[in-house]
Amino acid sequence: MSETMKERKDMDPQYMWDLSTLFKNDEEWNNALPELDEMIKKLPEYQGKLNNAKTIREFFDFDTHLGRKLSDFYCYASLRNCEDTRDSDAQAMEAKAYQVYTAYATAISFAEPEILSLDEDVLESIVHSDDLLPYAFNMQKLLDQKPHVLSAKEEALLAAFTETLGAPSKISESLQDADMTFESVTDSNGEVHELNQSNYILLQMSEDRTLRLNAFKSFYKGFKQHINTFAATYNGCIKEAVAEAQVRHYDSSRAMSMAYEHVPGVVYDSLVDTVRKFMPEMYRYVRLRKQMLGLDELHYYDVYTPLVAGSSKSYTYEEAQQMVLDAVTPLGEDYVNRVKQAYKDRWIDVYPNNGKRGGAFSSGTYDSNPYILTSFTGTLDSVSTIAHEMGHSQHTWLSNHTQTPQNADYTLFVAEVASTVNENLLVEQLLHKTTEPKERLALLNHYLEGFKGTVYRQTMFAEFERDAHAMAERGEAITAASMNILYKNLIKDYFGEDLVIDDEVQYEWARIPHFYRPFYVYKYATSYCAAVALSEAILNNEEGAVKKYLEFLSMGGSAYPLDELKHAGVDFSTPEPVSRALTKFSQILDDVEETLKKL
């Protein structure tokens, strides 16, 4: 029997995050609630008074101060719940934090409509006044939203439903992380393996095809049993987005989602169109994988296993730490020292435990350390995940230490750039040190997986989302059957005829949590393409590349994301960044074919 995961209480504290930069303990967190409640109650005192620059500045300053405290409060509760999603006390904390946030959203809902209801000439003079200089960009973004902001009464009504409208995502998350269990699976030797959310991909990477097949079937059997529930939650998420877009006078839910970041829909469509033009390269990859694995048929449970037998090298966490440090050395001494600080100050929650939230992420607030959740298992993917999340955390640190609170939060469009640059630096650094053909093929395989998983796969997700929301907007039913068909057809399009499409594949859409953040996934693909350009510039020692990149990381949310990327040297007004990235994918395939000749 394979080793089972530990309970949270049995984990070594040195490998658990230290949340004390948020709150020292749960008691201190609880004691923060009365002050938050009192501050929220003061917000309506400004209602009817936001008609001059001085009062608006005072209101913005108060809201910024409150927002920092509220962020700490919510973040701590959320991270505590991630430690063990079965912990009823932590569940209650997050629920309370969400209630407080809902109360805040309701209390402040009058502000934007009130400011935007001012006469045009009065509003113009306020926007350009010296009093509001620290909030100039925020005011510009607010003006951009003017046609879509409702009356104060309507905004208050929507805000009151914040917690309710977030239910589909919470239900899906709870079902997957806390309630769903999977049948244990056997390998080719009859050994039994526990199967859960954290180790599924690890089992799919096994060289034992029997284990891969059994894990694949057991995993998606679990999703099939709940597929109608997942369809209902996803339908709720889509209907919420579509309804809000309609009442806010947007052309579509996608237009609403993209408007805040000032990204035109043509960027989204250009991504899909350009990736589809490079489909032959993905089909080439699938054929190469089939050939290298020596299979008559390539199935979906064969797409994660390493291309080279015996190449599943394992790393300790300490080795992973050093590998990440070596990889980011081109970014300079200050960057390296901050990564060391992250290790020393326990920003990272390292290992899986029973009930721990699946996946990986970086979190934190303006006043706290950044925090990283991961489930390290010793694979190259696990090492890469640390590099990835450290990229997020360093982006957050630089933004928070450069920008004011109101300008520190970078948008989702640029959020994945820093993380992917770190991943690429890691692989390139390892390739540079490796001449042995098998090891080199393992690294090239990892690189290819990055392109497959982040450019092709996320673009496929983007198509799925675009089509699912469009179906709802046309009045078509969002059901398990319709989502299964849509997803299965996209798998066929993106992977081609050389991949056997097993029935279980059609349920995969149900396990993608990012679908509950509408039109987020395409940003993984655009970010990856931007990161390819930036990492190549850094490694090629292009003049000013590191300086411009670190400036980009320090910009936070002080400019629109397309402008920030343009400052760093990436222009998404053309298809060039996507074409350039997929040309790199083709070159890596060439490298694999050449390396194979040396075996």
Language-model region placement:
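A well-structured
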Residues: 1-310, 595-598
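C-terminal, non-catalytic "cap/extension" segments appended to globular domains
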Residues: 10-11, 111, 115-118, 126, ...
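Active-site recognition of the HExxH zinc-binding catalytic motif
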Residues: 249, 377-397, 419, 424, ...
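Long, K/E/R/D-enriched contiguous segments that form extended
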Residues: 292-330, 336, 344, 371, ...
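Catalytic zinc-binding patch centered on the HExxH motif and its immediate surroundings
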Residues: 310-315, 348-368
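Short pre-active-site segment immediately N-terminal to the catalytic Zn-binding motif
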Residues: 312-317, 365-387
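Conserved helix-loop functional segments at active or binding sites
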Residues: 326, 330-337, 363, 392, ...
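Post-HExxH zinc-binding segment in Zn-dependent metallohydrolases
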Residues: 410-438, 447-449, 453, 527
